[in-house]
């Protein structure tokens, strides 16, 4: 018996079509850098508006980090995204 179908089934449990499976830093439109956040309330709004993510919080470096970002929205560090131009 192959373990592949079982592993695949476990990966897909709970994931509905269109449901995000990743987290990440939203990208600034101006310079492609991570986005600064003064507080979690601002970050949550940034995540909704910039990354179409339902939630987010400020990390330890006051950078906005979003949860459940849709796969079609680029986040910082994705292949093909331009480097941060500070």
UniProtKB/Swiss-Prot annotation:
KW Translocase (keyword) present: no
Gene Ontology CC annotation, any one: extracellular region
Subcellular location: Secreted
Main location per the UniProt record: secreted
Keyword Signal in record: yes
Entry-linked SUPFAM superfamilies: Scorpion toxin-like (SSF57095)
Secretion signal, residue range per the UniProt entry: 1-20
CDD domains: neurotoxins_LC_scorpion
Pfam families: Toxin_3
Origin superkingdom: Eukaryota
Tissue: Expressed by the venom gland.
Molecular function via GO: sodium channel inhibitor activity; toxin activity
Alphabetically ordered keywords of this record: Disulfide bond, Ion channel impairing toxin, Neurotoxin, Secreted, Signal, Toxin, Voltage-gated sodium channel impairing toxin
Disulfide partners: 33-84, 37-58, 43-64, 47-66
Ranges for domain LCN-type CS-alpha/beta: 22-85
Protein purpose: Beta toxins bind voltage-independently at site-4 of sodium channels (Nav) and shift the voltage of activation toward more negative potentials thereby affecting sodium channel activation and promoting spontaneous and repetitive firing.
Protein family membership: Belongs to the long (4 C-C) scorpion toxin superfamily. Sodium channel inhibitor family. Beta subfamily.
Free-text comment about domains: Has the structural arrangement of an alpha-helix connected to antiparallel beta-sheets by disulfide bonds (CS-alpha/beta).
Protein name: Toxin Tpa5
UniProt lineage: Eukaryota, Metazoa, Ecdysozoa, Arthropoda, Chelicerata
């Amino acid at each position: 018996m192959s373990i592949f179908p079982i592993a695949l089934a476990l990966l897909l449990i709970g994931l509905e079509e269109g449901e995000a499976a990743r987290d990440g830093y939203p990208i600034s439109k101006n310079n492609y850098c991570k986005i600064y956040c003064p507080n979690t309330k601002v970050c949550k709004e940034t995540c909704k508006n910039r990354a179409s993510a339902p939630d987010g919080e400020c990390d330890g470096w006051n950078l906005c980090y979003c949860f459940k970002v849709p796969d079609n929205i680029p986040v910082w560090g994705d292949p093909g995204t331009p480097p941060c131009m500070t």
